[in-house]
Structures are given as C-alpha cells and as structure tokens.
UniProtKB/Swiss-Prot annotation:
Gene Ontology biological process: (1->3)-beta-D-glucan biosynthetic process; cellular bud site selection; fungal-type cell wall organization; hyperosmotic response; osmosensory signaling pathway via Sho1 osmosensor; signal transduction involved in filamentous growth
Its biological purpose: Plasma membrane signaling mucin that promotes activation of the MAPK for the filamentous growth pathway. May regulate beta-glucan synthesis. Overexpression provides resistance to HM-1 killer toxin.
Residue stretches of biased makeup (Polar residues): 54-81, 113-143, 970-984, 1071-1123
Signal peptide (residue range): 1-21
Induction description: Expression is highly increased during spheroplast regeneration.
Chain intervals for the UniProt region annotation (Disordered): 47-176, 261-311, 961-984, 1067-1165, 1534-1559
Cytoplasmic side: 1507-1802
GO molecular function annotation: osmosensor activity
Sequence repeats: 453-480, 481-508, 509-536, 537-564, 565-592, 593-620, 621-648, 649-676, 677-704, 705-732, 733-760, 761-788
Protein name: Signaling mucin HKR1
Modifications made to the protein after synthesis: Could be O-glycosylated in the serine/threonine-rich domain.
Species annotation: Saccharomyces cerevisiae (strain ATCC 204508 / S288c) (Baker's yeast)
Residue ranges crossing the lipid bilayer per the database entry: 1486-1506
C-alpha cells in the first residue's frame, strides 16, 4: 500500500507539473462572449419518452449497464408490458466514449431505438399559466480547505426556485433560469486563484399554449438472414398553436483555478448539458432560454428503408411555420483531454403560410445511386443552397426554375450504391426569397477569405464542329476550310481597365490576319495593334504599333515581308524617349550568295536619343551567328524589334536577353519564321520592371512538316497586373507540346486565358500549372456552347489534359462556369479516375420555353493535400425555399454518410468526405443568413478536428427489434467570437470556417473538420441512425427543422447586472487526490387540472475508478408536462466517486419504473456525463484574443509567434535529442569507439576568435551525446545556432536585446515521433516537467550562493560563437560526451560558471521554449575552462575526466571571496590534483588490507585441507570391535545408527557372510526393550536410556543390582561382564545422566578424583565390582549428546529426522509402508522388575516389523572385522570421546561372548 500511494503521489505531481509547464508558457484570455471548448472524454445521455392512453401500462427499462476496466463494453435491455395495444414507448440512448493518447483520439457513438405499434390522438384545450424561476448560486474556492477535502455540492429544486450551495465562504447571487452546476476541484500545494463573475439579463413574455398531436403507427421489422431488412415508420402529425411566457436570461460564470483540477457538470433549462475538466484556465458558461410565439406546427413523416448489403438510413422532414428558439452555451477552458463539444444552433427565419409534403426513399444495391426529384408549384420559384465541402473543394450552385418544372439529379458511384427519391414540394404563390453565398476554405490555420476589389472579367467562347461552321458572337470556329474569328476581352488594371481584343484567322489555304490591341498603362491607356499574315505562297505582312510610355505614348510601327524567293525588307520606327521621340529605322536584306556577319551594340543615353540602323545579309550556305546586347537607360523605355530569317538548309540558333529599365515599361515583340525542313528551338526570358506593367505578345508559326517546341517563362512585376495572351497553331501532321508556368504578383490578381486548337488528326497534350499570389484571388472563367450534336472533340483525336492548382496560404481559387442550354436536353458527364471512380450526372428537363441558367463555383487546392482523394461538391441555389436536400457520399470503406437538411430560409451546410484506404474523414460547416432579426451578428469559428474510426455491428439481433447505431464522428474544439451591433436593418450571420488537420494514422495524413452534431431545434427532431443486425456498415441520418419567427410580435423588458470578485491566495499544502462527493436532489412538481394522477420514479447510481483521477457528475432529469392532469415526480440521485491507482473501472446502472393511468403523456431527458482525464497528457495551445478576463500564470512568457528570418528558416526550432526509449548510443564505456568517429564537428564557415574572448567548453548530457550528433546533422546545427542565444540571454539587460534575441527564432513547433530514434523536445514529450529542468548533480545541490544576488557584467555578447564540437570520453558515463568550444567574453566567464552551477539562475529560465530546452541539456559537471589545460596546445582533452572531479562550488567561493577564478569551474578540479598525496595514503591502506586478507584466506584453506586429509586417513582404517559373530550365526547385526547432534548421523552396517537375499535381523529390535514412558533398556550394554522428543537416546542409569541375582550366583552377571569388558582403570570419567534414585553403585569404580576405573581383564567367575558415576559427569555427558543413540523402526507415530549434510529428511520406512517410532506404552512391565530373565529379554521379539532392507541400500557400508584387544581403533567421530568409544568397541566382543555363554548354559 505504501508503494501504491507513492505511485499515486508521483503521478499527481507529474500531472501538476505538466499543468504548471503550460501555465507558465502561455497566457489565455477570453471574455464571456468568446468561444466554446468542452472535452469530457466520456459522456452518456439517455432520452426516454412514454405515452399511454386510458389503460394500465407498465414499463421496466434497464437503459444502460456499462462496465469499463481497460476496455469498453455496453449492453442494454428493455422490457415493455402492455395490457392493451394502445400504448407506445420509445427510448433513445446515446453513449459516447472518447480515449485520447498523445497523438490520436477515437470516438464511438451508439444508439438504440425500439418501437412498437401504437396510436393515440390527444386534443388539449387552451391552457394559460405563468412561471418564473430563479437560481442562486455560490461558486468560490478556499485554498486551505481544498487539500483536505473537495467541495461538497448539494442542490434542491422546486417549482419556484433552485438553490445550489457549497461549503465555501464566498457567494455570488444570480437570477437566471434553472441551471444545476456541480464543481469539484483538486488543488496543488502552491496556491489557488479564484475568480467569479456573473451577468444576468432577464426578459419575460406571456405565453399561451395549445397543442394537438397525433402519433401514427410505427412498425419495425428485420430478417435474420442478414441480407435484407425493412423498416417502415410513419411518424407523428403534430399541430401546435401556442403562446409562451418565457424568461430569457443570460448567465456567465468564470473561475480561474491556478494549479487546480476542476470537474463540472451543468444541465441547462433547454435540456443541454456540459461537462468540463479544466486546469489553470477560466471557465465561462453562457446560456439563454428560448422564446416562443403563437404558431402552428404541422409535422408529417414517412420512413421506408430496405437494405441488402448495407443498412438503410431513415430520414425525417418536419416543417414548422412559426417558431423561434435561441440557446447559447459558452465555456472557455484549457483542457488536458479531448471529448464532447457544444452544439451550434441555427436561427432561421422565413415567411409563414406554407405547407410541405415530402417522401424520401433509399435503396442499397451493388452500385450506389442517389436521385432527388423536386416538383415546384405553379407560381413558385425555388431557392436553396447545398454546400458539400472538404479540404479542397467548395461548390455553390444556383438554379432558377419556372412553373411546372422539375429537377432530377443522379449520382453514380462505382463502389457502392444508394438511391434517394424525394417527393414534390408545394409552396404558396406569394413566397419568394433569393440569396447567394460563397465560401472558400484553405488548408492552413491562418487562411482567410479575401475578395479583391479589382474586378477581373474574363470571358471565352469555344465552338467546335467538324463539318459545319457556327457563326456565334464571341466564339471560335475551326474547320479545314473556314477561317476562325476569335475575339477576347481582358480587364486587369487596378485604376484603369484594359481593353484587349484579339482576332485569329487560320486556314491552310488562306492567310492569317491577326489583330491585337493591348491597354496596360496605369494612367494612360496604351493602344497596341499587331497584324500577322502568313501563307505558304505569299509574303507575310506584319504591322505593329506599341504605346507604352506613362506620360507620352509611343507609336511604333513595324512591317515584315517574307518570301522564300525574295529578300525581306523590314522597316521599323521606335519612339521611346519621355520628352523627345526617337526614330529608329532598320533594314535587313538577305542575299542567297553572300553571308553577312554583323555584331551591333546599342547604348541609349538619358538625354539624347539614338538613331541606329543596321543591315544583315545571310547566305543559304553559311549560318548566321548574331549576338546582340541591349542596354536601356534608367529613365527612358526601350522598344526593340528584331527579325531573323534563315536559309532553307541551315538552322538558326538565336539566344536573346532583354533587360528593361527600372522606371519605364518595355514593349517587346518578336517573330520567328523557320524553314520547312528544320525545326526551330527558341528560348526566351523576359524580366519586367517593378513599377510598370509589361504587355508581351508572341506568335509562333510552324512549318507543315516539323513540330515546334516552345518553352516560355513569364515573371510579372509585383505592383502591376499582367495580361498575357498566347495562341498556338499546330500543323495537321505533328503534335504540339506546350508547357507554361505563370507566376502572379503578390498584390494584384492575374487573369489568364488560354486557348488550344487541335488539328483533326493529332492529339494535343497540355500541362499547365498556376500559382496564385498570397493576397489575391485568381478567377478562371470559361464558357462553352455546344452544338445540337453534343460533340466536343473530333472523332479521331483525344485530349489528355492534366491541371494542378496550388493556392497561396491566404487565398482560394474560384473557378466559375456558366452554361446556357439549347431547346434540347443537355447532359453533362464528369468522370474522374483515381483510387475510386465517381460519376456525377445532372439531368435538366425544363419546359420548351424556359431558360435554365446555372452557375457553379469550384474551389480547388493543391493535390498535395489529397492523396488518393476523391470528393464531390454539389450546391444549388433557387429562388424559393425547398423542403429537403439529400447528399450521399459513399466510399470503399463501407461507410455511408447520409445527410438530410430541411432549408426553410437561407441556410447552407457544407459536407465533405474524403477517404484513404480504410480511414474515413468527414467534415461539416454551417453558415446562417437571417434576414429578419433586429441586430447584426458576426461569428467566426476556428475548428480543429481529429478523425475517428468507424465501428460496424456484426452480430444478428432479434427479428422484432430494430437497432440503430450512430457512426463515429469527429470532435472539434470551437473558438467563437461574436460581435453584436444593434441595427434597424437586416441581420446576417457569416461563418468562416478555417480548418486545421490532424492525422489519424502516421502514413495517411488527411485533414477534415466537422462539428460535433447539428443542434436539434424542436421536439420533433431526432438524431439517429439505422443499423441492420446482420449488417457490416453503419449509417448516420440527421433531420433538421428550421422555423420562422417573422410574425412574432413580442415586447420584452431588459435588465442586466454584473458581479465579479477575485480572490488571490497562496499556501503550501501537500497535494491530495481523493474525491468523495454525494449529491442529493429531490424535485417535486404538482399541477392539478383534473382528478387524475400520474407518478414516475427513477434512480441512478454511478461508480467510477480511474488510474489518475475520476469525476462523475450526475444530473437529475428535466421533465416537462405537456398533457398531464396531475403529476408527481420524485427523483433522487446519489453520486460516489472512488479512485484506484492501478485500474480504471466504471459501472453505471440505471433502473426506471413507471406506472400511469388515464390519459397522460410525459417527456423526460436525463444526462450523465463522466469525465476521465489522463494524467500525463498535455496539449499546448498558443492563442491571443481581445478578451475581458485574462488568466494570470505563475510565470508569464510571450505567447505570440516569433518571426522567422531567412537565416533560420531551414532549421527546426524544436530541439532534436536522442529518444529515451533507444537508450544511450553507447551502452557501456568503450573508449575505442571514438576511432570510428570524426575528431570534431565544425560549422560550414570557420569562426575566428574575437577580441577579449576566451575559448570555453560547454558539455551536454546523454540526450545530446557525440555519436547522436554525428548521426543527426540538424541536432548539431541547432547547437551552433542556438547555444550562443542561450548564453546571451542572462546578459541581455535591455528589452531591445531581448527582442532581438527572440526575433532570431522562428515559431515554436510542437512535434513528437514515438518509437523513433530522434524526437523533438516539446511540451508533449516532456509533459511530466513543469519547465525544462536540468538533472542536477551533487555539486549543484550543495551550492550555497545564488546568482540572484549577483549582477551580470556589462559585456558585448554579439560575438559569442561556437567554434566546434568535440568528443570527450568519461569512464563514469556510458556515452561519449559532446563538448562545444565557445568563444565567450573573458570577463563574464566567472559569472557564466556561477549561472551553470545555480539551478535557479536565469540561464535556465529563458522565455523561449527551444532555448530553455537546450539550456536544460547542459551538463554542469563539465568545467568551462579546464579541458584544454592539461592537453596539447590545440585543445586536447583529459581522457578520464569525470563530473566528480568538479568539487563543490561553495568551496571555491570561500577561497575566492572576490568572485574571481583563474580557470572558471576548473579551479576545484585543479586543486584536486594537489590533494593527490592524501588520496594516495588511503590507496596504500586499502592495498595493505587486501594483501593481509588474501594471506589469511590462503592460510585458512591450507589448515582446512590438512584437517580434511587427516579425517580421510582415519576413515580408511577399520575400527576394532568387541562384537563378534554369533556362534550359531542365527542373527547378524545388519545396521546400527548412532546419532550425535554435533557431528550428524553415522550409519554402520555389518554384512553377513551369507548372500544379501537372506533374512537379516536388526540389532535394534533384539537389544532394546521398552520399560516405561520414554524409557528403554539396552540388553547388550545393560544401560537404561531416556528417549527425548527427537527420538534420541539419553543415558539414564545402569541395570538394577538385583538383575544379576536372577541369573544365579555364579558371578557371571551382565553387570560384571559390562564392567570387565567396557571399562578399565585408565578410562576417563564417562559423562552420563542419572535421573533415577537407584544408582548402580558398585558397578563402576570411581577414584578419589571422580575418574572411573576401567579394568583390562576379567574372569567369568569373578564377582562384579560396583562403581558409581557422579551426577555432574553423567549430566555433562548427556548435555553434549555424546551418548545419544537414535532408534528407528519402533512405535506407530511418524518419525523423521533431518540430514544436516543434504538438507533432506531421512524417513525410516518399513515393509508395511508406514512410519513408526517408539511407542510410549509398548510394554507394561518395567525393566526394573526382578522376574525378567536376561535370556527372556534377549529373545523377546518386538511386535514391530523388521526394517526394510532398502532403507540402508543407499548408505555406505562399513565392514567391522574381528580385531584383537590390542589393536587400535579409528573412530569416525573426531570428538573428545575417542577413548571411550575405543574401549566400547574393544569390550563389545567380550560381552557378546559372555552373553552367548550364559545362553548356552541355560
């Protein structure tokens, strides 16, 4: 338990440190009208509705049973019992579980819907009542009490008021609608900041309610085979007319909890609930109640669904004529986990008096199909918008229909099928509305929509027909025999539009006349006209006129005449000077026989015009090499025209370079004519001036037999638009390959139009790339008119066109196309082949006299953001309000997203779906246009989304049940800013959604965004999905009701109040993390209209255990009586929260019981939200908003991104270090590894030593070891660039220096790559640290002097630079240390050393996270100035330098009071060398001790060896024995075990002379007789023994004196035999134990010294000599266990003995298999009786079985041979009793002989 608590405390400290880290790094500010963020990671909501009619009805439901312990499981069951089939019940359960790791977040939604047939009609008379509710709430925090226990919150509610109170001392009253809020907080030890604010606004309106509802039949059916299911539901028809008296209130609460953990759950009057987990952030809640006016509500719904391979979606349409509702919930917080987010509610208005009927059907087949049919009434027009948006495309379409027109659209998807059919729409004739909206989305966080003020009008018309020419104004006509007339107009100038007109006429047999006019000057239009006439048999006449000067137009005319047989005469006139025109005339004459080589140089002066005339003549047999250089004056434009004519047999290579003056535009025209047999390769580069636009026109004419390859690059000026027109004409037999690149200026839009005309027999391959400017839109417009035969290309050609568009970060590209239809039907087919095929077909069938203009806008982004991406965008806008629009997007991942949206006023919704492999990403964005409100609301949202995987049910269910499951959706944090301005005009809400992307998988990064869900407006709205039991897919269907309140006339009173309080305190209290909350709420509401009654009872219990922290908030249900005569509701909710540090367990059980009578109906909703937050996950958000409340932090750091100059743009600012998972690069100390590494890492540019600088050394920890730096150049580059900034920061004494330092870094980037060898330091990867702290060495812990009291020296830090990085091998470290050599100011080295050794110095508190992270990686054990002290002159290093060599800095301070060091931190290191003598003394002592210890061990081993050897010699000898073989050989001594506790057990065996199979007898059974309790007598030794608890025999006394008398008087008694055989006079005193009063005196002879006399010989007839042993001798003998004998095989109890040598137990087993010991009462007659004869005792057989022979089979046999009396005996017991044992062995044989002799006599 102690270790478990320690783990919990460490986990809590880690979490609080992570909170501190982000609190110190970022300032978050917001106000009550700012955005919403709420992320409970687990939420459960249940909605149940029950109605009955006139009969008893019992319902038992167990809506949810959830168990969560590491994984998630859910089960639900419902039991319905109806006595009559007149009741209906439906239940909706939604459970959302969200789990977030460092990078991913998954979400699962499930819902279950069970329906039974029922029908009831409930008319209710007019009701009138008034209700007012107030709430009083206290919300504060006491830092001292938080650590001891959490705030206990209790609430009570009645019909008049709701009171919420806490145990805190401060309170803020409020007056709002009923809201129940529960907060629990956990505080850290540092302190708490509490802040509370409230604003109350109240509006009261009287209300009247009248409602008539009819619930139709609901049926559900499903088949068990899994291939088909059918569900038909006819929902309710509801008509409501009512007036409400509703309070409209706004309340905001804000609580700033510094270093605290807060969990709150709130239920609002509108039925919504939120749950927040906050940390170091303000919590703001803002809500408003809804208002209703007199209206009529009619709702009809019909649902039909048939599914084969995938489930079907049921859609519902509800129309409400007049209804309004407004509810806003705001919560701003900083969360440690992700979860649910508030919903966005739409406000829609439109004129009333309309009825809608719609029928929708869906069928799933092998191919997905969707069909929508709209029928419009006679005088109505339709206006609607459907916007389907993804990361790249936004489309908006507008359709105008006429009376009795219909629109039919079909979408065909190759991989899935889905068809939707919607019925006609009927509308009143007086309804009309029109609106158009445009949305642009860019895949960048900082993107925004920018509409340029410069008009760009581009119009093109194409007409193609192979056999007939079509004369159309503004059209192209191309045929083999008819020329083509083309006219185009471009407008591009910001201040003066430019009119450009071009006409091209092409024919094989007719000359081509081209006329162009360009106008480009900002202040004076320029008229430029060019005419080109080309013919194979006629000369070409070209005339050009250019006007380009800003103040004086220039007239330039050129004429070229070319002929194969005649020379070319060229006359040119140029006017270029601003004040004086310059006339330049040039004539070129070519002769077939004389080559001309001409080189000319032109120089124009600013003040004098130059007239230059040149003549070139080339011959057909020699090439002409022409080199020209033109230099224009700075103040005058230059107009240059050149013409090159080559001979028929020699190609001409021409290279030209033009340089324009900075202040004047340049007009350049070039014409190239090549020979029929040689191709011409032309390369041109044009550079325009920065201040004037450039108009450039080029024409290329190719010969019939050779292709022309042209490559052009255009660069426009930054301040003026460019109008560029190009025309390409290819020969009939050769293809033309054209590649163009356009770059637009950053401040002006560019209008680009391209026309390609292909010959009938050759294909055209065109590739174009467009790059837009960052701040302007590029509008591309194309218009096509088709012939009645619908032929676009000629029959024998194909066109392969590939286009890629790359938008700027802040602008989108809008392409608009407009089509006008002929009287016939037109079919447009769009086919795209990618990872999947999608075909969209539109069919328009208007009346013969109707025009159907359609406008579509497509916004494309770069294909780099869409890998394997395909999406469709459909958007239409009409002039009446449609009823329903369905959009279906199907993908290969078996995911069907079906969205149904009812648009009564002007509402657009953007839906997009993209897929990669099996990942689904879908997004949705909303915008609202409200024309009838009283104020102007502007809303902007920032949405970030994370993709969630799809779960599909795969198990079959019952046939009678209908299960529906919601597909997973993405959760989005919102940041909303609202600005309300009261006005008398219209109200417009514009929502711009800017998307940021999040990757679901590392390999497939996509971006998408979608709100959590669409807010349901009225009670008839549902959010559901249908899943067939055997299906493998899931479908989501959403239905919306949009209502109108334009006819509502309400008057309201307004009042507001604001109260705020701030309390700041700081305490140091140990952190606690235990929460126990019990909330009890009893709600009663009684309204009596009739004598009927209804009761409802529900109870819920929640218990949760979490690894880090668990919070449960349970809110009572909010009940509303609609049609009830009498109602009594009682509900009690108790909440208990527990915590388990090892597991996470969640158990939720809900039980509801309800009984009702008479006609009644009720509707209840209950919400339970449970938040479980991870302990170590932190997300950093940097934002800056103009807000009212600013959250203070303990340490304030800049939060604005820093500019990124070009010098560091390529270098990531996230510090790259080696991941801790991979471990150090070198596992152990291996100095030889440096042989394969470079000697140093140097920068690209060598660093020279500045003046007054010293070369110091900075070492780094293992995260930046040398091997890692060699393998990761970016990491070493960060040291070269960022380490000087780290060292400069403590010496920056002015704000400008700090700002300059800050400006040198780019924006900090959060990045983390798990599992890789390289990671980046970011708040995510170091979330367990409050700030990036260093690993402190022992030296830093002992530091006594802080650098806070010191003042940094005033030095110039601009020259600090890193010279190189070198390796250093340290035997105490398992890696190669990286040491950076830095040039540092000499006078500041001492102060820098103090900063490094002080853990609280400013060096480690850099406000920039990258620099602070790098400072935390500095190893303070590496000295600054001593690594090169004992090395070579070039900076060699001490090879075994360790951090321990650097002594305590306090010692250095005591020795150097003035604060100066000679060698910096190496002073103590140098001093350690001077103390080497004292250190050597200790080493000598240790060596001497080791030598003495070794010698002692060797001596001990030597003595033990000789003792063991002596023992083995004694064992080899055979001991003498007095025991002889029996004369009759009847019994042989098999074994005798003598046990002595001091030396272990020894077993001796004497083998009989017979074979081993013969029967043997144990001497133990023959010679031991039980004489009493725990006593035994030995008949051989004639000794009396006592048996102890271990089974050992202790010597007791000898045989009684009268024992020999029973054997006769011949003097041959046993005592005399024992005395004569066993003892002699020289024997030492025998130790024995005599506990009997009867001593056998006279048997043993004891001398005056107490010694026993033993005699060597005896006589059979000699009388026994009595002798006596002293008691102390015998007692001492027994104490030493020198006479213990253990008997085996006696008794019936289990007896075991431990073998001290082997550690095993030796068990004496007998043949019967049982274990026996000596019994306590085996014999009743004691041995002391005189009636027992010796021979009788000897031959008395024991009743116990003989020992098993196998017991001794594994024991070592010891042969006892006959020995004489004079032989020596070697005893195996090397003890002090050797003499006694020897005598016993000598006398044993004599005893046996005497015994046998007595037996023979008898």
């Amino acid at each position: 338990m102690v270790s478990l608590k320690i783990k919990k405390i460490l986990l809590l400290v880690s979490l609080l440190n992570a909170i501190e880290a982000y609190s110190n790094d970022t300032i978050y500010s917001t106000s009550y009208n700012n955005g919403i963020e709420s992320t409970p990671s687990y939420s459960t909501s249940a909605i149940s509705s029950t109605g009955s009619s006139n009969k008893e009805n019992a319902i038992t439901s167990s809506s949810e049973t959830t168990t969560m312990a590491g994984q998630y499981g859910e089960s639900g069951s419902t039991t319905i019992m109806d006595e009559q089939e007149t009741g209906t019940s439906s239940q909706y359960i939604s459970v959302t579980t969200t789990t977030q790791t460092s990078d991913t977040m998954s979400s699962v939604k499930k819902s279950t819907e069970i329906a039974t047939p029922s029908s009831s009609i409930v008319p209710t008379p007019l009701q009138s009542y008034s209700d007012e509710s107030q709430i009083s709430q206290t919300l504060s925090h006491n830092p001292k009490s938080v650590a001891e226990s959490d705030s206990d919150t209790t609430s009570s509610e009645s019909s008049s008021s709701v009171i919420i109170s806490t145990s805190d001392s401060s309170a803020v009253p409020r007056e709002i609608s009923p809201i129940i809020t529960t907060d629990s907080q956990i505080s850290k030890e540092e302190g708490t900041l509490a802040q509370t604010s409230s604003i109350s606004e109240t509006t009261r309106i009287a209300q009247m309610v009248t409602r008539v509802s009819q619930i139709s039949s609901i049926t559900a059916a499903s088949t068990i085979d899994g291939f088909s299911s059918e569900s038909t539901q006819t929902d309710f028809s509801n008509t409501v007319s009512f007036e409400n008296s509703v309070e409209e209130e706004y309340a905001m609460s804000k609580s700033q909890l510094s270093e605290s953990y807060s969990s709150s759950s709130t239920v609002y009057s509108g039925g919504e609930s939120t749950a927040d987990k906050t940390s170091s952030s303000p919590i703001t809640s803002f809500s408003s109640s809804y208002s209703q006016t007199t209206s009529t509500e009619t709702s009809e719904s019909s649902r039909v669904a048939v599914g084969v391979s995938r489930p079907s979606s049921i859609t519902q349409t509800t129309s409400i004529d007049s209804f309004s509702m407004s509810e806003v919930e705001l919560s701003t917080y900083y969360d440690l986990s992700a979860g649910n987010y508030p919903d966005q509610e739409l406000i829609v208005d439109r004129p009333a008096t309309s009825s809608t009927a719609e029928t929708s059907s869906e069928a799933s087949q092998g191919v997905s199909r969707e069909s929508n049919t709209f029928a419009v009434s006679s005088i109505s027009t339709t206006n609607f918008i459907v916007s389907s948006a993804s990361d790249t495309v936004v489309s908006t379409s507008s359709t105008n229909t006429v009376p009795y027109s219909s629109v039919h659209s079909t979408f065909v998807h190759a991989t899935s099928s889905s068809t939707y059919i919607s019925s006609s729409l009927y509308s009143s004739p007086s309804l009309s509305a029109s609106v158009s909206s445009h949305f642009g989305v860019a895949p960048f966080p900082s993107a925004y929509i920018s509409f340029s003020s410069v008009p760009v009008a581009v119009s093109s018309t194409y007409t193609s027909s192979p056999s007939a020419s079509v004369v159309v104004p503004s059209a192209y006509a191309s045929s083999p025999s008819v020329p083509v007339a083309v006219s185009s107009t471009y407008t591009s100038s910001p201040s003066a539009p430019a009119a450009i007109s071009s006409t091209y006429t092409s024919s094989p047999s007719a000359p081509v006349a081209v006329s162009s006019t360009y106008t480009s000057s900002p202040s004076a239009p320029a008229a430029i006209s060019s005419t080109y006439t080309s013919s194979p048999s006629a000369p070409v006449a070209v005339s050009s006129t250019y006007t380009s000067s800003p103040s004086a137009p220039a007239a330039i005319s050129s004429t070229y005449t070319s002929s194969p047989s005649a020379p070319v005469a060229v006359s040119s006139t140029y006017t270029s000077s601003p004040s004086a025109p310059v006339a330049i005339s040039s004539t070129y004459t070519s002769s077939p026989s004389v080559p001309v080589a001409v080189s000319s140089t032109y120089t124009s002066s600013p003040s004098a015009p130059a007239a230059i005339s040149s003549t070139y003549t080339s011959s057909p047999s020699a090439p002409v090499a022409v080199s020209s250089t033109y230099t224009s004056s700075p103040s005058a434009p230059a107009a240059i025209s050149s013409t090159y004519t080559s001979s028929p047999s020699v190609p001409v290579a021409v290279s030209s370079t033009y340089t324009s003056s900075p202040s004047a535009p340049a007009a350049i025209s070039s014409t190239y004519t090549s020979s029929p047999s040689v191709p011409v390769a032309v390369s041109s580069t044009y550079t325009s001036s920065p201040s004037a636009p450039a108009a450039i026109s080029s024409t290329y004419t190719s010969s019939p037999s050779a292709p022309v390859a042209v490559s052009s690059t255009y660069t426009s000026s930054p301040s003026a638009p460019a109008a560029i027109s190009s025309t390409y004409t290819s020969s009939p037999s050769a293809p033309v390959a054209v590649s163009s690149t356009y770059t637009s200026s950053p401040s002006a839009p560019a209008a680009i139009s391209s026309t390609y005309t292909s010959s009938p027999s050759a294909p055209v391959a065109v590739s174009s790339t467009y790059t837009s400017s960052p701040s302007a839109l590029v509008v591309l417009s194309s218009t096509s008119t088709s012939s009645p035969y619908d032929i676009v290309y000629s029959p024998s050609t194909f066109a392969a066109i590939s286009s890629g568009y790359t938008p700027s970060p802040s602008a989108s590209v809008a392409m608009s196309s407009t089509s006008s239809s002929s009287p016939y039907d037109i079919v447009y087919s769009l086919s795209s082949s990618a990872s999947r095929s999608s075909i969209a077909t539109y069919e328009f069938s208007p009346s013969p006299s109707t025009s159907l203009p359609t406008s579509s806008t497509y916004t494309y982004f770069s294909s780099a953001y869409a890998f394997e991406f395909s999406s469709e965008r459909y958007s239409t806008t009409s002039t009446i309000a449609p009823t329903q629009i369905h959009s279906t997007l199907s993908r290969i991942t078996d995911f069907l997203l079906q969205t149904s949206m009812a648009i009564q006023s002007i509402v657009s919704q953007q839906i997009s779906t993209s897929s990669t492999l099996n990942d689904e990403i879908h997004s949705s964005a909303l915008s609202v246009f409200n024309p009838s409100a009283s104020n102007l609301v502007e809303t902007s949202l920032i949405i970030s989304s994370t993709q969630a995987s799809i779960t599909s049910p795969k198990n079959s269910a019952k046939i009678s049940s209908l299960q529906s499951q919601l597909s997973s959706s993405t959760k989005n944090p919102y940041d909303t800013a609202n600005k309300n301005t009261e006005t008398s005009g219209r109200s417009t809400v514009v929502s711009n959604f800017l998307y940021t992307s999040s990757a679901a998988k590392p390999d497939n990064e996509k971006f998408s965004a979608t709100p959590t869900e669409i807010t349901t407006i009225s009670s008839s709205s549902h959010a559901y999905s249908l899943s067939i039991p055997s299906s493998h897919n899931s479908v989501t269907g959403l239905s919306h009701n949009f209502v109108d309140s334009s006819k509502s006339a309400t008057s309201f009173g307004y009042s507001s109040s604001s109260i705020s309080s701030i309390k700041l305190s700081k305490e140091t209290i140990p952190a606690s993390k235990s929460v126990s909350n019990t909330q009890e709420r009893i709600t009663s509401f009684t309204s009596t209209l009739r004598a009927n009654s209804q009761s409802e009872k529900s109870e819920g219990r929640n218990s949760v255990g979490s690894l880090q922290s668990s919070h449960i908030s349970s809110n009572p249900s909010l009940s509303t009586n609609t049609k009830v005569d009498s109602k009594s509701l009682s509900r009690k909710v108790s909440k208990t929260m527990g915590e388990n540090g090892e597991e996470t367990g969640l158990t939720t059980t809900k039980t509801q019981y309800k009984s009702s009578s008479e006609t009644s109906g009720s509707y209840s909703r209950s919400f339970t939200k449970i938040s479980i937050g991870p302990a170590t996950t932190a997300v950093q958000t940097q934002a800056s908003t103009n807000s009212v409340f600013t959250a203070p932090a303990l340490s304030t750091y800049p939060t604005t991104p820093y500019p990124s100059p070009n010098s560091y743009a390529w270098l990531p600012t996230a510090i790259i270090v080696e991941s801790s998972e991979t471990g150090p690069t070198t596992a152990s100390f291996n100095p030889s590894i440096t042989g394969s590494l470079p000697n140093a890492i140097e920068p690209a540019v060598a660093v020279s030593e500045p003046i007054n600088h010293t070369l110091i050394t900075i070492g780094f920890t293992a995260a930046l070891n040398y091997v890692f730096l060699v393998q990761n150049p970016l990491s070493s580059a960060q040291i070269f660039n960022f380490l000087p900034l780290v060292l400069k920061y403590p010496f920056s004494n002015t704000s400008s220096e700090l700002d300059n330092s800050i400006g040198e870094l780019s924006t900090f980037i959060l990045s983390y790559r798990s599992g890789s060898s390289t990671t980046t330091l970011s708040p995510k990867s170091i979330s367990s640290l409050s700030v990036v702290k260093k690993k402190k060495n022992q030296q830093k812990k002992n530091a006594t002097k802080s650098t806070e009291d010191l003042h940094p020296p005033q030095v110039d830090t601009s020259s600090i630079a890193v010279k190189k990085i070198v390796p250093m091998v340290d035997s105490s470290k398992a890696y190669i240390v990286s040491v950076a050599e830095v040039y540092f100011p000499t006078e500041a080295v001492t102060y820098l050393q103090q900063l490094i050794l002080d853990e609280n110095s400013t060096l480690y508190s850099n406000p920039q996270t990258p620099l602070r992270s790098l400072a935390g990686l500095i190893d303070s054990g590496i000295p600054l100035g001593g690594l090169t002290l004992y090395g070579s002159g070039d900076g060699g290093y001490v090879p075994s330098l360790t951090s321990s060599s650097v002594l305590d800095s306090s010692k250095g301070n005591s020795q150097n009071i003035d604060g100066t060091y000679k060698y910096g931190a190496l002073d103590d290191f140098i001093n350690s060398f001077t103390d080497s003598a004292s250190a050597g003394k200790y080493a000598v002592k240790i060596i001497i001790f080791l030598i003495v210890l070794t010698i002692g061990v060797l001596l001990w081993l030597f003595v033990a060896f000789f003792a063991f050897r002596h023992r083995n010699i004694l064992l080899k000898r055979h001991p003498r024995n007095c025991i002889g073989k029996s004369l009759n050989n009847e019994r042989e001594l098999e074994s005798t075990e003598l046990s002595r506790s001091s030396s272990g057990n020894q077993v001796y065996n004497e083998k009989p002379p017979e074979s081993e199979n013969e029967s043997v007898y144990s001497a133990v059974d023959d010679h031991y007789i039980v004489t009493g309790e725990n006593t035994v007598y030995n008949t051989i030794h004639r000794l009396h023994y006592t048996i102890n608890d271990d089974g050992d025999l202790l010597y007791r006394d000898a045989i009684p004196l009268d024992f020999d008398q029973t054997n006769g008087d011949d003097g041959s008694g046993i005592d005399s035999i024992v005395r004569d055989c066993v003892y002699d006079k020289n024997q030492d005193a025998t130790e024995a134990f005599l506990n009997d009063e009867e001593s056998i005196s006279g048997i043993l002879d004891v001398d005056e010294n107490g010694d026993i006399r033993l005699y060597d010989s005896y006589s059979d007839n000699e009388e026994s000599n009595s002798f006596h042993l002293p008691d102390e001798v015998i007692e001492n003998y027994n104490k030493n266990h020198l006479c213990e004998t253990k008997l085996h095989g006696l008794g019936t109890e289990s007896c075991t003995t431990d073998d001290p040598d082997t550690g095993n137990q030796i068990t004496n087993e007998f043949s019967t298999g049982s274990q026996t010991c000596l019994p306590s009462t085996a014999y009743t007659t004691p041995l002391h009786t005189n009636s027992i004869k010796l021979h009788t005792l000897r031959y008395t057989e024991s009743s116990l079985p003989k020992p098993n022979q196998t017991l001794f089979s594994n024991l070592e046999d010891l042969e006892i041979e006959d020995i004489d009396d004079n032989g020596s005996v070697s005893d195996v017991h090397i003890e002090e009793l050797d003499a006694l044992d020897e005598e016993l062995y000598k006398r044993m044989s004599k005893v046996i002989k005497q015994q046998n002799h007595q037996t023979t006599k008898i």
